[in-house]
Amino acid sequence: MNLKKTENALSLTLKNFIKSESFGGIFLFLNAVLAMVVANSFLKESYFALWHTPFGFQIGDFFIGFSLHNWIDDVLMALFFLMIGLEIKRELLFGELSSFKKASFPVIAAIGGMIAPGLIYFFLNANTPSQHGFGIPMATDIAFALGVIMLLGKRVPTALKVFLITLAVADDLGAIVVIALFYTTNLKFAWLLGALGVVLVLAVLNRLNMRSLIPYLLLGVLLWFCVHQSGIHATIAAVILAFMIPVKIPKDSKNVELLELGKRYAETSSGALLSKEQQEILHSIEEKASALQSPLERLEHFLAPISGYFIMPLFAFANAGVSVDSSINLEVDKVLLGVILGLCLGKPLGIFLITFISEKLKITARPKGISWWHILGAGLLAGIGFTMSMFISNLAFTSEHKDAMEVAKIAILLGSLISGIIGALYLFALDKRAALKK
């Protein structure tokens, strides 16, 4: 009965999100594998040279642009973070993070799932040049994790899928905070003041409920530039922009107009082909239906396929390729061990222990329909840290510490793969055990 209620509570938006993210996870994995294959083939020199190719335009002696790698990591990933920000705002206002009762359990789980891996890594790499990489195993890749959980189908309770999604959203928010606090260097306050001015203008537009997305996006570009110049990673600008996008919907008059158009269409005669009148009515219905959506919903709907099927796979292809040969030093500090143990051990232990203790102390309550064994399984899948972990590794290790960056990427791939396989097998076995008991 409780499971049925949970399933009914899962909105259509959330179901569509699961489907798109799960497919995106599979596509992401294929691109990561392809990157490793190309980086270790006869094409490896061309592969690595490609990402350092400058792309932009020249004005006299002045070049405006970036390398392809920077375009992907700083510009395209800003759109990915904009999508993340929109998802977080939606969940905070209307979803599983909209009340303390709903949010407390997954948020506490996310905190435990970030602290434990970070501590494991830091303990192993303390007082070394690689200690700054503690943020790498703290992240969860929602696309990969959902890709695995959706392959298990009905063997996994719907309530567990909701929990994992909410945990991953809270984890993304935590990762954004970590990036802003620990991976910011050489702050330039003049540019920060410029960014603050842009944010104030965005806040005024939000207050006025400006429904056109164009002013927000144009100001978002300016905000990105100011934040990029300030020393804070530019993707933070995308998250701030997301929180400034209005979520209010228009008055009920639009609903009435939509109903009248629906009645008009129903009254028209139907044939093998649509008449000109029917086509015009359907076009009007489409326009009115779009107008009923909030700017946040419209932007999220637009960005979802771009993020899932283009930006993240391209990021994976550009960043996952590591040439594994005799020149790579896998023993650089304890990066390999720190990342793998952080993802495979720290994530499940952190999530399980902090939620177990918080429930015993009556701080929060476990969602109905989920056992502690399920929580442990979700913790294992949360150890799939691919996209955000790769992103943080690029911030943590500069070109001067290239060996550590390459080892971290190998560790992320291995740790994520181990977590995904063990998590999937564990949840599969858990379902089989439950079926035998029945």
Curated annotation (Swiss-Prot):
Keywords: Antiport, Cell inner membrane, Cell membrane, Ion transport, Membrane, Sodium, Sodium transport, Transmembrane, Transmembrane helix, Transport. InterPro entries: Na/H_antiporter_dom_sf, NhaA. GO terms for cellular component: plasma membrane. It catalyses: Na(+)(in) + 2 H(+)(out) = Na(+)(out) + 2 H(+)(in). One of its GO terms (biological process) is regulation of pH. Na(+)/H(+) antiporter that extrudes sodium in exchange for external protons. Belongs to the NhaA Na(+)/H(+) (TC 2.A.33) antiporter family. It is found in: Cell inner membrane. It comes from the Bacteria. The chain crosses the membrane at residues 23-43, 62-82, 104-124, 133-153, 162-182, 185-205, 221-241, 302-322, 337-357, 372-392, 410-430. HAMAP family: NhaA (MF_01844). This is Na(+)/H(+) antiporter NhaA. Its main location: membrane. It is a multi-pass membrane protein. One of its GO terms (molecular function) is sodium:proton antiporter activity. The keyword Lipoprotein does not apply. Pfam families: Na_H_antiport_1 (PF06965).
